[in-house]
Amino acid sequence: LDQSIKTFSLSTAYDLSTASLIHTLSAPSNSSTSQQSIEFNTNGTKVFIEDGDEIDEYNVATAFDLSSTLTYVDSLDFSFADHITSMAFSDDGTVLFLLTQQSNDGDDTNDANIYEYNLTTGFDLSTATYVEKFNVENEESRPEGIAFNSDGDQVFITGTDGKNSSNDEVN
């Protein structure tokens, strides 16, 4: 499998018809073969790459430029869960949400869930502490994507099990 992250330049902002590939980052040597999600901090000096059962944190030498030097910082081990498919941070990086798919092994500890972590320091995985999990199996047993509205009071989940996309109020 070609596990890589591709960077495209858009000569007109938000216009994909102007896209051109400018860089391909091969999967870091310490990674598995299942990167599905990538997030940057707000100023682009950190990148977070989902790597199967963990989230890896890297410093980026030049903001939002994956062709610059990436330095491994830390990871959040998630091996107790089945498979991370997506992640989202709060705007200030003090809350991290991880979306997981259920396994097919009959072990109900690996249901489709959103895991919430608080980060004492924004966008710093070494300060992460578990808060809670929210089960979404009844709405979507094979979730793939997670997003929040700008107020953070609605979460949107997409998936592939044939159920409709759902959005739930966040209390």
Predicted features by range, described:
Residues S4-T7, E54-E57, A112-E116, E169-N171:
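A short loop-to-beta-strand structural motif that recurs across blades of beta-propeller domains
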Residues E50, L99-Q101, T158:
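Residue-level marker for isolated small/hydroxyl-bearing positions within beta-strands
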Residues D2-S4, E54-I55, Q102-D108, D161-S166:
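Short glycine/acidic-enriched loop and turn motifs that connect beta-strands
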Residues F40-N43, D91-D92, F148-D151:
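Residue-level detector of Asp-centered blade-edge/turn motifs that repeat once per structural unit
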Residues S20-S29, T71-F78, T129-E137:
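A short beta-strand motif characteristic of beta-propeller blades
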Residues F8-S17, E57-S67, Y117-S126:
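Short loop/turn segments immediately following beta-strands, especially the blade-tip
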